[in-house]
Structures are given as structure tokens and as C-alpha cells.
């Protein structure tokens, strides 16, 4: 029989309020440090930047906006933040949630209304995931708005685990070592995209969003299934992290610790220059293998 008194059981099973507050403060401090470090490492924010924060209503983008607001309060340089959401006219989308939240915290915002949902559902065959085309159309709409409004940076809520998952997606399905960089210039050269959550784990974001009680909008309103390939990679990474804690962190660090001479990309390292003698060039191996070498006397 359990001889523990009820009051004693409550003490041992319920975290004390002070302890909960301390844990929340530690979590917020860790996220601020990681986001600040990413901003500094990659030069994400400059003086007088006009930053468009893409806000979907999910845990990642809420955390991104919250962190940038906290860091701006103590930043050594001034910069502007504007939250922008794309209303894609998905059925059941709660249009009131973001305006009410953003107004309550005093953040300037704009809602772009563009019916990409109808286009995607019409073009994509039934049973196929809508995510890829939906993402491209969403990106196009956001980039177009950023250009018309003169934003200098576009901030996205991708985190460390997203970056690692994208690396493996490209490795497994596209035979290339590439991922999701913390900072990039768009293909058309008009936009600089930043990912301030590049050092933050998804686990911490989930805990932080829960602690802050953000009004989360689900991302499955369209009824589309998650991309199967990405889902498989996610399952793999979660299994690794469970069996080998910190493995995802190690992989993320490796993405910034490249050794071109230890790989096989000829565009990154001049392997042909590694002849037996420094001033003796190697023969044209491609021509030789094709049988076109001028002095090839083989029968």
C-alpha cells in the first residue's frame, strides 16, 4: 500500500510554479542566444533593415517573430519588422486569429489575399500531395509583395531540424549534397532570405510555443497529406535522436564544416592539379577513356 500522504504525492508529482517559471526563462534565454548567434554568424540583419517576417500561424513562425521582437529591443542597430501572412483561401482558415494576435502585441502586419488553394487543387492530381506546388506559389506571392513594399530582408521560420531534413532529402532523392542555407539570395537576385532559427531545435520550439500559448493555426486545413519522402526522413531523424541524443546537432554542425578536398566535386577542388609532379599536368583522362588520346597506340 502507498503510505504517501496526498499532500506529499502532490509535491513529488507536480512541478513547483517557481521551477516552471525558471525552466521557461532558461528556454527563452537559450533561444535568444541561439537566434542572436545565427544572426551574428551570417550577418542576417543590418542597420535600418526593413524585414518582412513571414507568419503562417504555426509554431515556427510565431517563435521567429517573438524572438526577433525580443532581440530588437536590445539590438545595437535599428531595424523594422512587419508580419506578413498569405491567406490562400483554404476552407476553414480562421481569418481572425492572426490580426487579433498581431494587434494585441502591436506589430505592423499585412494579410495578402490570394486564392492559390483553388489553383493547386485543380492542377494537382487527386491523391497527390499539394505541398510542393502550394509552397512554390506561396513563395512567389510573398516575394512579389516584398518587392512592391521595398523590404530588404525576408525572414522565414525554418529551424535546425528542417535544414538537416532538407539535406537528407536532397541526398537520398536528388543525389546532391545541398540543403537549406541560413541566408541566401533568391534565384532572381532581388531578395535576401534569412532563417534566424537556423540553430534552434524543433523540440525547443515546440516547448516554447506551448509556454507562450501562441494561437496556433493548423497546417492541414487543405486536407493534403504530408510529403511522404519528407515524412520518412523525419521518422529516420527522430529514431536517430532517440537512440543517439545530439546526433541531429552533430549533423547540423557538419553542414558548416565542409572539406571539399575530402569529397569528389571537381568544381570545388582542383583534383587534376594533383599530378605526380607539380609541373607535370595529368593527361586528359576523359579523352583517354574514350579512345581519343592522340598517342594512343593500343590495338
Swiss-Prot record:
InterPro entries (alphabetical): Rossmann-like_a/b/a_fold (IPR014729), TilS/TtcA_N (IPR011063), tRNA_Cyd_32_2_STrfase (IPR012089), tRNA_thiolation_TtcA_Ctu1 (IPR035107)
Position of sequence motif PP-loop motif: 56-61
Highest taxon, organism lineage: Bacteria
Subcellular location, record wording: Cytoplasm
Regions that span the bilayer: none
Pathway where this protein functions: tRNA modification
Residues the record lists as binding [4Fe-4S] cluster: 131, 134, 222
GO biological process: tRNA thio-modification
Cofactor: Mg(2+); [4Fe-4S] cluster
CDD domains in the record: TtcA-like (cd24138)
RNA-binding found in the keyword field: yes
Database matches in NCBIfam families: PRK10696.1 (NF007972)
The protein's assembly and partners: Homodimer.
Role, per record: Catalyzes the ATP-dependent 2-thiolation of cytidine in position 32 of tRNA, to form 2-thiocytidine (s(2)C32). The sulfur atoms are provided by the cysteine/cysteine desulfurase (IscS) system.
Record protein name field: tRNA-cytidine(32) 2-sulfurtransferase
Gene that this polypeptide is encoded by: ttcA
Amino acid at each position: 500500500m502507498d503510505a504517501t500522504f496526498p499532500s506529499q504525492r502532490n509535491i513529488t508529482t507536480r512541478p513547483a510554479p517557481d521551477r516552471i517559471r525558471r525552466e521557461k526563462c532558461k528556454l527563452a534565454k537559450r533561444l535568444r542566444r541561439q537566434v542572436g548567434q545565427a544572426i551574428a554568424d551570417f550577418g542576417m540583419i543590418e542597420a535600418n533593415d526593413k524585414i518582412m517576417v513571414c507568419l503562417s500561424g504555426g509554431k515556427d513562425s510565431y517563435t521567429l517573430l517573438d524572438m526577433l521582437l525580443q532581440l530588437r529591443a536590445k539590438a545595437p542597430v535599428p531595424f523594422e519588422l512587419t508580419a506578413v501572412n498569405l491567406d490562400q483561401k483554404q476552407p476553414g482558415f480562421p481569418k481572425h486569429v492572426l490580426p487579433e494576435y498581431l494587434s494585441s502585441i502591436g506589430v505592423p502586419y499585412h494579410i495578402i489575399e490570394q486564392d492559390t488553394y483553388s489553383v493547386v487543387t485543380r492542377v494537382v492530381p487527386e491523391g497527390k500531395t499539394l505541398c510542393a506546388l502550394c509552397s512554390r506559389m506561396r513563395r512567389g506571392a510573398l516575394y512579389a509583395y516584398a518587392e512592391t513594399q521595398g523590404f530588404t530582408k525576408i525572414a522565414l521560420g525554418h529551424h535546425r531540424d528542417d535544414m538537416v531534413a532538407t539535406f537528407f532529402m536532397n541526398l537520398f532523392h536528388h543525389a546532391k549534397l545541398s540543403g537549406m542555407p541560413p541566408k541566401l539570395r533568391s534565384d532572381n537576385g532581388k531578395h535576401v532570405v534569412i532563417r534566424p532559427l537556423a540553430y534552434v531545435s524543433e523540440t525547443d520550439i515546440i516547448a516554447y510555443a506551448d509556454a507562450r500559448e501562441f494561437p496556433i493555426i493548423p497546417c492541414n486545413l487543405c486536407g493534403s497529406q504530408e510529403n511522404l519522402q519528407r515524412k520518412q526522413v523525419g521518422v529516420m531523424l527522430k529514431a536517430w535522436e532517440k537512440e543517439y541524443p545530439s546526433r541531429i546537432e552533430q549533423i547540423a554542425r557538419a553542414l558548416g564544416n565542409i572539406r571539399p578536398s575530402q569529397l569528389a566535386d571537381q568544381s570545388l577542388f582542383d583534383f587534376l592539379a594533383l599530378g605526380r609532379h607539380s609541373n607535370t599536368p595529368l593527361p586528359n583522362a576523359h579523352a583517354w577513356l574514350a579512345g581519343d588520346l592522340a598517342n594512343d597506340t593500343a590495338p
